[in-house]
Amino acid sequence: MRMKVSDYIARKLVDEGISDVFMVTGGGAMHLDDGLGHEPGLHCTFNHHEQACAIAAECYARIHNKIAAVCVTTGPGGTNAITGVVGGWLDSIPMLILSGQVRYDTTARSTGLGIRALGDQEFEITKAIDCMTKYCEMVIDPMRIRFCLEKALYLAQTGRPGPCWLDIPLNVQGAYVETEELLGFDKNDYEAGGTGWSVHGTGCDGCGLCAGKLIQGKPAMIPEDEAGKGEKRELLPPSVSLDLAREIVKKVREAKRPVINAGNGIRIGKAFDVFQRVVEMLGIPVVTGWNSLDCMYDSHPLYVGRAGHMGDRPGNFAVQNCDLLLSLGSRLSIRQVGYNYPTWAREAYVIYNDIDAEELKKPTVHVDMPVHADVRDLLEKMEMVLEVEAVSADGGPKDKEAVDWWISRCQQWKEKYPVVLPKHYEAGEDQPANIYAAIKEISRRAEEDQITVVGNGSPCVVGGHAYEMKKGQRFISNSAIASMGYDLPAAIGACLADHTKDIILVTGDGSIQMNLQELQTIIHNHLPIKIFLINNGGYHSIRQTQKTHFHEPLVGIGVDSGDLSFPSMEKLAWAYGYPYVAAHHNSQLGEAVEQTLATDGPVICEIFVDMEQNFEPKAAAKMLPDGTMVSVPLEDLAPFLPEEELAENMIIPMIKPQ
């Protein structure tokens, strides 16, 4: 069938199961805009900034592991999308970005000269995004379009997921091709070390048409095709053997103080259900991490807490005191192991699972048993082993009494050290609300199976501390790049990915300014997003940093530095057409949250909070008597406990800061 390339792309996306596209139109993508916008099988959401498109698509993919496409124009269209793409790259989120480009004969690359640009608004985006994509290519041959699309979609979702980007010049977008002549991507050839070119088209058996495209048995590819391509070959993990699964189960059964560290790879790897079953079969404590809060609900009897640099006391006490740590689907970043990483889980036998073999080699993590495996495959094999051993006489832990004591100890930590404390509710009518009380009031009213998205800064940190997860809930943040401005577009992506319940968004007065224009996208599309805006007078995370490490006056913080200001959110709500709710004191929190959640459609609830409330607990440097600042182990979180109390919580020997 004769078809324009841009129309073929649109139809191909639908055939591959994609139903949503986030885009900002532009002249450099005019054929793509036309093809995607008129494809009946695609729902196009038109944002007001390309960064918002990319962030929305990233969050969309987090909800049900389904890709949404992004379409932007040449030059600034592509560069604007970069922050959202690097967020997907670092957090291992599958994405497909399509960008328009000037006609190939007006690109600097086509001249062979060292000029910066030739065409109008030209920028060779592939050179900029090679470091944040699994595969990128400027598609200069219309006959490669099927291959490039299939390759991009395969790589984005295979192994460790991540973004793939195709840059498509105008002359290629508008070219016509016979779709039967297009050659596809052969994943088997690719994984065997080949290029992935299918020798023949679909259903073809050595026809003359395909033979005419071959050069010495290979499809015709010229060096110019390779010049605009970036690609990272990935070693896919082998299938997990039952012997390996059995060895892991054996190690867990032999431990007296085992704990599971559940990472977000469990969600990304579609392993959530089997993870829940394996946890019940193993019957050992579980901690979650910075971006994996929703791997287990808080009231589960085996859930302990959140571990890591921004974790809580129960979670870190469990990790630091364990004698075996089974880490599943977590890359164990610095935020998980802390800056004093030699002291992390220092007396534990560490079984470290990751789908990326390179992550297992990091010098910041001590590993006794590295497990290069797809977490779903690993858990399914462990489940098979456990199902067999469950009916045998020795199916449980070797020392059941010790493990039962350990589970009880973990629950004691959980009960003794809640994040939200009575003091957070003490503020009177003459004082601002407390952010910990605010997060508590929002989370206790959120429903099961509801999605909460948080912006970066206070909502992410305090939300990560204090949000009480219920069954089926999702808690979405971008943890690695942690860009301000994530909030509104991420909530849009989550809302379009899941229509079953209203979306809760918790963001800050600083972060929301970075993509404020997306308030219009929400209101235009009638998206039921409940926006809780934490007003702490500016950039509270940086305020704390400057107060801790530098002298006043503060710089570039907000109301207390005097050199940065923010508009009235009440007036902005009116301008954009949002209902507006406000809470100035703790006593107003409950009613304000309930009113917001009961409002039909999008709504803004502004909560004015105390600017003096620091994040707590958190990892922090400790000053020695001689004035030296040192990073302490993760069991010793600020505000620091008395040494006697800390010692009471340690089963293993304490380390004296020095």
Predicted regions and their residues:
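N-terminal alpha/beta PP-like core and its mobile active-site loop of ThDP/TPP-dependent enzymes
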Residues: 1-390, 445, 528-531, 551-552, ...
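Active-site diphosphate/adenylate-binding microenvironment
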Residues: 6-9, 14-19, 24-27, 32-39, ...
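Active-site nucleophile and cofactor-binding loops and adjacent substrate-binding regions
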Residues: 24-26, 45-55, 70-77, 140-141, ...
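Conserved structured core elements
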Residues: 26, 269-272, 276, 316, ...
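Thiamine diphosphate
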Residues: 38, 98, 106-120, 309, ...
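A structural motif corresponding to the C-terminal end of an alpha-helix
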Residues: 132, 441-450, 573-578
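Phosphate/pyrophosphate-binding active-site segments
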Residues: 143, 192-197, 201-231, 235-239, ...
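Hydrophobic, well-ordered secondary-structure segments
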Residues: 336-339, 347, 382-387, 395-398, ...
